[in-house]
């Protein structure tokens, strides 16, 4: 079986998750950037699609990839994932990120967690998070996100 993992990432976490996912898959697996690669799906039996979520939106490259390839994807085995802090069981969350047809067709749809790499963040995001951490009570309800490898294994 030949599998593609198509991803888009802002700071590298989604690519890292794609690389972890690859270790759980069998056969030939290619990791492809939705931003950089022209992707010919006809050579693949299965496709996993993942992106990171910022301000409630997934990268436009993932949205465009899904729209452009929707008909073909609906005839393939697919899995969908996001890297974010939102739990996978948040009602209606995935419907704002992926076409409903893909969600209904997918073998598995999940959030695989994520991580905050402050060194890679732009100045605005870095200042925002450092400011939030200074607010009384914020740290009580906040824990640094982590990549959920067990959820990645389920996706495979």
Features from the language model and the residues they span:
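N-terminal beta1-alpha1-beta2 submodule of the flavodoxin-like/Rossmannoid cofactor-binding fold
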Residues: 1-74, 153
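FMN-binding flavodoxin-like domain, especially the glycine-rich phosphate-binding loop
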Residues: 24, 28, 55-156
């Amino acid at each position: 079986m030949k599998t593609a993992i198509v991803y888009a990432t802002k700071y590298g976490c989604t690519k890292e998750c794609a690389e972890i996912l690859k270790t759980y898959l069998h056969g030939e697996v290619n990791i492809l950037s939705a931003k950089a690669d022209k992707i010919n799906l006809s050579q693949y039996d299965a496709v996993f699609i993942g992106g990171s979520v910022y301000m409630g939106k997934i990268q436009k490259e993932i949205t465009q990839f899904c729209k452009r390839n929707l008909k073909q994807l609906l005839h393939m085995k697919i899995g969908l994932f996001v890297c974010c802090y939102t739990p996978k069981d948040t009602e209606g969350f995935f419907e704002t990120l992926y076409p409903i047809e893909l969600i209904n067709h997918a073998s598995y749809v999940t959030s695989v967690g994520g991580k905050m790499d402050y060194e890679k963040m732009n100045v605005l995001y870095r200042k925002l998070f450092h400011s939030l951490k200074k607010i009384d009570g914020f740290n009580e309800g906040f824990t640094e996100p982590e990549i959920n490898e067990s959820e990645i294994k389920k996706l495979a």
